[in-house]
Amino acid sequence: MCGIVGYIGKRDVAPLLLEGLQRLEYRGYDSAGIVITSPKSTGLKMVKAKGRVRDLEARVPKRFAGTTGIAHTRWATHGAPSDENAHPHLSADNKVAIVHNGIIDNASELRAKLVADGVVFLSETDTEVLTHLIARSQAETLEEKVRQTLKLIEGTYGIAVMHADFADRIVVARNGSPVVLGIGEKEMFVASDVAALVAHTRQVVTLDDGEMATLKADDFRTYTTEGSTTTATPTTVEWEAESYDMGGHDTYMHKEISEQPEAVDRVLRGRIDDRFSTVHLGGLNLDAREARGIRRVKILGCGTSYHAGLIGAGLIESLARIPADAEPASEFRYRNPVVDPDTLYVAVSQSGETYDVLAAVQELKRKGARVLGVVNVVGSAIAREADGGTYVHAGPEVCVVSTKCFTNTVVAFALLALHLGRIRDLSVSDGKRIIEGLRKLPGQISEILETEDEIKKLAAEYADAKSMMFIGRVRGYPVALEASLKLKEISYIHAEAYPASELKHGPLALIEPALPTVAIVPNDDLLEKNRAALEEIKARSGRILAVAHREQEKADHTIVVPKNEDELDPILMGIPLQLLAYHMALALGRDIDKPRNLAKSVTVE
């Protein structure tokens, strides 16, 4: 993986592809490459570079003309970052070029057979295997060459293929890794993400797993990997190209943190029903009888989405009185879980394409489970695979680390919990209480954002820490987990999160002045328990930064946040910790939008 972009038409292709790669930079990558041709060309022309897209652009010669091309940003899975391992990959006769997201599971076996037949490999990647297999196919058409090759491989892929002898087309295919077609006026685009397309077209077709497409300048057709024709109905992308710009901010992360009041307002808009103190979530495909029959809720996600799911599980238990828990999707799918028909499964993913979550959804569907999706991207794989769901309406999130999407996902869970609760036993007065709390959120988030200068000063005091501990109790624990993840993702400071109740069971051994502790201390029924934890840390000379609703005398510093309903407090307590991580990383000179070794959308195992 990580980013694919392609074009066929009449325009000069290299600038279009480089622009597309720049719009995909947020996904994370370590190298980039481009290959082009045209109907009048005698072959393929390729340039690759380890590093950033700007490094690739610097290598592209001035005379590099063509009207058809594919390009790629790579995030290493097989082989270290290098010019040789960067995509595209060319066949030995320089006729076949391919870019690929995904992992070929049987690449080693296929590679050994090709080497035995005399094929010389120039890279360590699994992708190069595909290139040689396509080149060696005796099929008469490029489509059939690709189909024959796909029958030989095991694994996941999103690919785009060019051939010097078929310069009038690009062939693409999908299995487990996103491929989106962009439909223009006598021109066609392909990408792994609509971000690369929206500057040129809003009409898109998202391929399903097991589907292929042939793109020509003036038309396209879709079909299965078995050769059967499929029907492709274009949809309109709602996001504008400007949504992917920084809008005057120094980083995408800062922009996205600052957008949270508007983002939360957007996820609430049109969903609240004051008459009955409930909410309407039209895409759930879950009627009242089915909702009353739910005996358990299991939430699946990865990383930040998993943390949002932990808060969501607490909201569902509290408001709907249904037993609920959350689990990393990457663990769930490998432990042969018992799938209960009375359990509602909820899959959470910002992109809607996260491989481990998607694989868990597909396994659940095979076993007859009911699955809802909570995603940000309309038309994504999880949205299509699930029985129903809700969109979080955060808008495009470009920074690799998630901020506004995390917040909106938790708000979406609050809406889901309220919806289920009012169908079951939640009172009108409690429904009204939660609705009033939800309506306060945008204004309260704005209040927190206005304290950024104070948080920036605190960040400077803690930026020299080599390690940090985050603690919280019950609702506060997932906030601690997410804050810990944010800090390690962008500052590279080691951080751990523990339930505050577990301090005596091991973590107290770590407490010393050099290890700051960030404590989540809401003004709820556990306030005194949390204060006792601060006492234990202070007794061992630990430094404490508290996030609380009022100053904490045992803390060295306190970030004070507005009080909402107890159930909704985690949403607000996470916001200042996003800013803390941001400014600590900034003080350390980190590449905040593109942290090392990370990708925005993890579409491989």
Located regions from the model:
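Conserved short alpha-helical segments that host acidic/polar catalytic motifs at enzyme active sites
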Residues: 1-246, 250-251, 259-296, 334, ...
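A SIS-like phosphosugar-recognition module
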Residues: 165-166, 177, 204-248, 252-256, ...
